[in-house]
Amino acid sequence: MITTDLFTRGWIFIRGVPAMKFLPPEGPPEIAFAGRSNVGKSSLINALVNQKGLARTSNTPGRTQELNYFVPDGFSGEGADLPPMALVDMPGYGYATAPKEKVDEWTKLVFDYLKGRVTLKRVYVLIDARHGIKAKDDEVLSLLDKAAVSYQIVLTKTDKIKVAGVPRLIEETLQKIKKRPAAFPFVLATSSEKGEGLEELQAAIVLAANGG
C-alpha cells in the first residue's frame, strides 16, 4: 500500500524517454503531469517531494522535451525490488515558437504514451490559475477522454491571483469539465511557491496510485 510517507523519501531521476522504445518496462504505477509550457510542472514535482533540484525548471518554454521519470531512492529496480510508484514529467504543449518538426515529435510521444501505457494510473493536467483552460488544454482533455485515461485538473500558481478568486475559478473549471467522461470531478488548487495545496495533491496521487 502506497502512503504519503513516500514523498518524504529522497527521489531520483532515472531516465528521460525521447521515444516509446526507451520506456522502462511496465511495473509500478505511474502518475504523469501534463500542461502547457511554463505552467509549472517541474516546480510542482519539486515541491511535492521537497527537492528543489529534482526536476529541472527553466524560464525557457519547451525545456522538457522528453518523458522524465522520477522514483523514490533506495530501490534497485531489479526483480521484485521495484519502486512503489513513478512520477512522469511530460513535455509541455502549446509552445508556438518551437520548430514544427520538434513539436510533432513531442506530440506523438505524448499521445502514444497516453494511449498505450497500462501502468499509467492518472494524469494530472496542470492549468495556470491566471489563464484558466485554454484551447490547447481542451485539445489535450479531449485526447485523454478518447483514450479513456483518468485525469484530474490541478490549478497552479494560485498565489498569483486574488485569494477570493480561487473558489470561483475552481467552480468555473468544474463546469467546463463536468461532461468530460475521463475527468475526475474534483479540482485541486496549488501554489508551489507558497506550498499551498501540496498535501491534498499528495493524498490524491496516493489514492490514484492505489487504484482509487
From Swiss-Prot:
Gene3D superfamilies: P-loop containing nucleotide triphosphate hydrolases. Mg(2+) binds at residues 42, 64. One of its GO terms (biological process) is division septum assembly. Its cofactor is Mg(2+). GTP binds at residues 35-42, 62-66, 89-92, 156-159, 190-192. Necessary for normal cell division and for the maintenance of normal septation. This is Probable GTP-binding protein EngB.
